[in-house]
Amino acid sequence: MKPSIVLYKSIPADLHQRLEQHFTVNSFEGLSSDNQPELLSALQQAEGLIGSGGKIDQAFLERAPKLRAASTISVGYDNFDVDALSQRGIALMHTPTVLTETVADTMMALVLSSARRVVELAERVKAGEWQDSIGDDWFGVDVHHKTIGILGMGRIGMALAQRAHFGFSMPVLYTSRRPHEAAEKRFGARRCSLDTLLAEVDFLCITLPMTEQTYHMIGPEQLAKMKSSAILINAGRGPVVDEQALIAALQDGTIHAAGLDVFAQEPLPVESPLLKLPNVVAVPHIGSATHETRYNMAACAVDNLIAALTGTVTENCVNPQVLQQA
């Protein structure tokens, strides 16, 4: 008899068939109260869980007594209580490698669109404001040869540094607990303190995950140390930046502009002051949102779950210590 799993996000048909080759698949659209009775019944027998979003905490896990593995179709896993999973011996799988290049593309797009005011000026053209030769009130700022600072020199940070260094001749600064030899050798990246980085960079690019240590890592004190011409880019997690402090800094000219793919609350409320600021490019958490990458993420998550439930995991496990307990 095949193990039972719960799938709570639509995936391409061929990937669904791959799951069905190994498991009895109970499919749901999200983890909501709309499907609560059927979902609760399926969870009682489920050995595997695959999807994205939703809060997977202690209370949820108590409804899934047979669960052995959870596979998220994402690199981030801050919606999972990792400690609770680990205590129950449940492996948590994620997709850290397949979205690297696409997220780096998104970050570079935010750098360019914020610096050159692409979104704002496109809207002005559509509104009929382009009536003559443009003046300096339509001008942006250069990207090439400007200094980029990267908070989070992991896979995505490295891919962003590659684009900045080779594509735009940008000096690269970064902060980390340990030197990143590959970044320094390939891109001439310079490791420095956060204060030094904030003071020197023209573009502050954040790729950090949300943890207790990174929560509001960039607040009013840090923003005040930046150049008034600096642009902040966040494609990590929204709460890494104190959003109210950022709004104030953008309103009073402490910094020049921001390109944001992530927010404190998502979806971003329509009444957010960020949406009223012309110096903000706000996009709806599209970091990995291409057809190709989202397919690859789902495929990776499927393979991850199969590996976790067949004892063949070699990578992508958030809490690998539970594999040794099995």
Curated annotation (Swiss-Prot):
- Keyword NAD on entry: yes
Q: Provide the Gene Ontology terms for cellular component.
A: cytosol; plasma membrane
Q: Which CDD domains does the UniProt record give?
A: GDH
The annotated active site, in chain numbering, is R237, E266, H285
- Subunit text: Homodimer.
For this entry, the protein name equals Glyoxylate/hydroxypyruvate reductase B
Identify one Pfam family in the record. 2-Hacid_dh_C
Please state which protein family the record places this protein in. Answer: Belongs to the D-isomer specific 2-hydroxyacid dehydrogenase family. GhrB subfamily.
Known role: Catalyzes the NADPH-dependent reduction of glyoxylate and hydroxypyruvate into glycolate and glycerate, respectively.
What EC number(s) has UniProt assigned to this enzyme?
1.1.1.79, 1.1.1.81
The upper taxonomy is: Bacteria, Pseudomonadati, Pseudomonadota, Gammaproteobacteria, Enterobacterales
- Out of the domains of life, which is the source? Bacteria
Gene behind this protein: ghrB
